[in-house]
């Protein structure tokens, strides 16, 4: 069993893809370590996992995966950090530092720099370099030549629409519906990617 040997967990975003296994690891696999994340990721991730549990609990394939108590146990281990706050690990991780940088993809989302001596490892998944209305894009200016960069290419094929055109289309659609005495419902991702 590897989970009891884990010294620290770094969480980058609050959605199921990034935090979904944590309650299971704490509740069923015996994980017992500090979990580092920004405060928004901590709070939204906890709400997201409550919601995930409540919407899936009656499905046969989900029963006994984890409980709400497992969610509480996992999120009680969180150590909230601020962007650019240097945190030093203790115990077997003595001498290892971690620092969160804004990922620009979700509220509180983080790119992580993990350092030991003169070597840095950067973990950067689901980041966005473009400034949006509610989030600044990420910047790698403070990260210089890491020994290892871990990233993803999940959005590489996604075509990014022109911001002005996109905004005009949604406003036109909303106004058209309202002018016909219709209702407008705008569903959003509960994990902070609004």
For each feature predicted by the language model, list its residue ranges.
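His/Asp/Glu-rich metal-coordinating catalytic cores
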Residues: 1-10, 15-19, 24-193
């Amino acid at each position: 069993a590897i989970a009891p040997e884990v010294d620290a967990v770094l969480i980058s975003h609050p959605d199921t893809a990034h935090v979904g296994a944590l309650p299971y690891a704490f509740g069923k696999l015996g994980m017992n370590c500090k979990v580092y994340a920004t405060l928004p990721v901590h709070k939204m991730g906890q709400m997201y996992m409550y919601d995930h549990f409540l919407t899936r609990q009656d499905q046969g394939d989900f029963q006994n995966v984890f409980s709400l108590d497992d969610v509480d146990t996992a999120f009680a281990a969180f150590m909230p950090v601020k962007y650019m706050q240097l945190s030093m690990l203790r115990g077997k991780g003595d001498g290892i530092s971690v620092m969160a940088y804004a990922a620009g993809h979700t509220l509180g989302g983080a790119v992580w720099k993990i350092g030991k001596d003169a070597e840095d490892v950067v973990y950067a998944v689901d980041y966005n370099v473009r400034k949006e209305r509610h989030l600044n894009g990420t910047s790698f200016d403070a990260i210089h030549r890491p020994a290892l960069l871990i990233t993803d290419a999940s959005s590489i094929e996604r075509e990014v629409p022109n911001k002005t055109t996109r905004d005009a289309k949604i406003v036109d659609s909303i106004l058209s519906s309202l002018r016909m005495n219709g209702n407008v419902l705008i569903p959003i991702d509960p994990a902070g990617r609004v």
